[in-house]
From Swiss-Prot:
Its main location: membrane. This is Putative uncharacterized protein YNL174W. Almost completely overlaps NOP13. Keywords: Membrane, Transmembrane, Transmembrane helix. The keyword Transmembrane applies. It is found in: Membrane. The chain crosses the membrane at residues 15-35, 58-78, 94-114, 148-168.
Length: 190
């Protein structure tokens, strides 16, 4: 897992914006390529387990930024999540640091949760329509939305559901992984 501080002090707004634009561009390209690959794939829905994890076109990044009293960005932390096999490998501060706010890629959270633990959720499987390479498209959309939210300076997290066309929001990351996932799942059951 690659951790890299891009900005640690104030006065780095240009760098923050550059990183946001770069991610937005790369995720947009990933989205286009994912659609292209998706057209070549067939639907594969399993009754007992979710489809096997497929390679990604681009690594997924989580953007964090701390805020000063006047809410201006102070720092940016990029976490490359591509090597994560399960939540146990995630750094402790990822879900516990109350001083960090993020426009986080919740698509990746769901993806790694479902594929690493092979969770069977019949209702979610029907509503989200899991299929081969479908999650690649799903993640591309969520990455794009995360990049956009970071660009506009949002401190909330949004999950874009292409099949349901609604947003799930989470304003606090002080909870445990299970709490966050349970909130998301409960929202999906509505």
């Amino acid at each position: 897992m690659a951790l890299e501080f891009l900005a640690a002090t104030r006065g780095m707004d240009n760098l923050v914006m550059s990183c946001s634009v770069t991610l937005l561009f790369s995720s947009s390209l990933s989205f286009v390529l994912a659609i292209k690959n998706l057209t070549k794939s067939s639907f594969v829905v399993s009754k007992d387990k979710l489809p096997i994890q497929t390679p990604y076109l681009f690594s997924s990044f989580f953007f964090f930024f701390t805020t000063s009293p006047d809410s201006s960005p102070v720092g940016v932390l990029i976490v490359d999540s591509s090597p994560w096999a399960s939540f146990s490998e995630a750094p402790d501060f990822f879900f516990s640091a109350s001083s960090l706010y993020s426009s986080i890629d919740l698509g990746s959270i769901l993806y790694f949760a479902f594929n690493s633990s092979r969770v069977t959720l019949p209702l979610l499987k029907r509503r989200f329509c899991f299929f081969d390479r479908g999650m690649e498209l799903f993640r591309s959309i969520s990455i794009s939305s995360s990049a956009f939210l970071f660009f506009v300076g949002s401190s909330k997290a949004f999950l874009t559901c292409s099949s349901l066309s609604f947003f799930v929001t989470a304003s606090s990351f002080d909870s445990s992984v299970s709490d966050i996932l349970s909130q998301i799942i409960e929202s999906c059951w509505v």
